[in-house]
Swiss-Prot record:
Protein task: Kinase involved in the non-carboxylating pentose bisphosphate pathway, a nucleoside degradation pathway present in some halophilic archaea. Catalyzes the ATP-dependent phosphorylation of ribose 1-phosphate (R1P) to ribose 1,5-bisphosphate (R15P). Shows weak activity towards various other phosphate acceptors, such as xylulose, 2'-deoxyguanosine and D-ribulose. ATP is the most preferred phosphate donor, followed by CTP and GTP.
PROSITE patterns noted in UniProt: PFKB_KINASES_2 (PS00584)
Protein name, per record: ATP-dependent ribose-1-phosphate kinase
GO MF annotation: an example: kinase activity
Organism encoding this protein: Halopiger xanaduensis (strain DSM 18323 / JCM 14033 / SH-6)
Length: 296
């Protein structure tokens, strides 16, 4: 079985279904409330486990009740938590996700002890023994150290820096990544508003660009592919991008077929958007059934 480590944030999410996302001085009605695990790295790890990948996690939580809930949720998903640091007297990051009727999301939250793992806390042995490492938003020095260790060991690296890409210096981790994930806004920051893959600093590796309900595209040194996505009724888009990344990684590591990985990733993202909660990625059987219904 393929072994993948995800590194980055581990959150506890409170999802509030609202009638609309309020503007400044506005108000919205809460229709329902639920709690679940969250955090991009944790979401990817849980999604990979659901896709029958041996998934581990590098991150940190507090020793509070939310940390217990976050770890319990990941353990039940089948994620190896050996690399998760428990910070004494620390507060686990909590995110409040406001989700409107169209499934669009706004996020409020605190980082808590999310970035307590520094380069000196990394277990290099676990990285060297992995088949792949997936980086998400985290301390730039930690991301760089993990990527550097993986590169030295011949372990492939993917990176989804997320919304903080323009605010933090991820240069070393970006340079070390074999696969990059970004949405349209992040791509603009990545390519400095040029939107051109060829001739950019990243045209020697795989770049997957997520377009939400409009699907995604992937660029490689040997060609580009576009997938229009799947038509689903979006309920909650939180975690859909993480499910996309997990689906792409799981498929690409299995057979190296980038076009097939793009299709599979879109299916994972669509199925996640059709369900509530950031931790709602599908199982391998669910993805297989979804694709079979559309192409058989």
């Amino acid at each position: 079985m393929v072994r993948v480590l995800s590194a980055g944030h581990v959150n506890w999410d409170v999802t509030l279904r609202v009638d609309r996302l309020p503007e400044a001085d506005g108000e919205a009605s809460i229709r329902s409330q639920r709690q679940s695990g969250g955090g991009s790295a944790a979401n990817v790890a849980a999604a990979l486990a659901g896709l029958e990948v041996d998934a581990g996690l590098i991150g940190s939580v507090g020793d509070d009740d939310n940390g217990v809930l976050a770890r319990r949720d990941l353990e039940s998903a089948g994620v190896d938590l050996e690399g998760v640091r428990i910070v004494e007297a620390g507060q686990t990051a909590v995110k409040y996700l406001l989700v409107d009727d169209d499934g669009e999301v706004a996020v409020l939250g605190n980082d808590g002890v999310n970035e307590a793992v520094g380069p000196e806390e990394i277990d290099e042995r676990r990285i060297r023994n992995a088949d792949h490492v997936h980086l998400t938003s985290q301390r730039p020095d930690t991301a760089a150290a993990i990527a550097r260790t993986a590169n030295e060991a011949g372990v492939t690296v993917s990176f989804d820096p997320g919304r903080r890409l323009g605010d933090r210096d991820y240069g070393e981790a970006l340079a070390a990544a074999d696969v990059l994930f970004a949405n349209d806004r992040e791509l603009a920051a990545l390519l400095e508003d040029e939107y051109e893959y060829v001739g950019s600093d990243f045209d020697d590796r795989i770049v997957a660009v997520k377009h939400g309900s409009d699907g995604a595209e992937v660029h490689t040194p040997t060609g580009s592919y576009v997938h229009p996505g799947f038509d689903v009724d979006a309920v909650d888009t939180a975690g859909a991008g993480d499910a996309f990344a997990a689906g792409f990684i799981a498929t690409w590591l299995t057979d190296g077929d980038v076009e097939r990985a793009l299709e599979y990733a879109n299916a994972c993202g669509a199925l996640t958007a059709g369900r509530e909660g950031a931790r709602s990625a599908p199982t391998a059987d669910a993805v297989a059934a979804f694709l079979s219904e559309r192409f058989d």
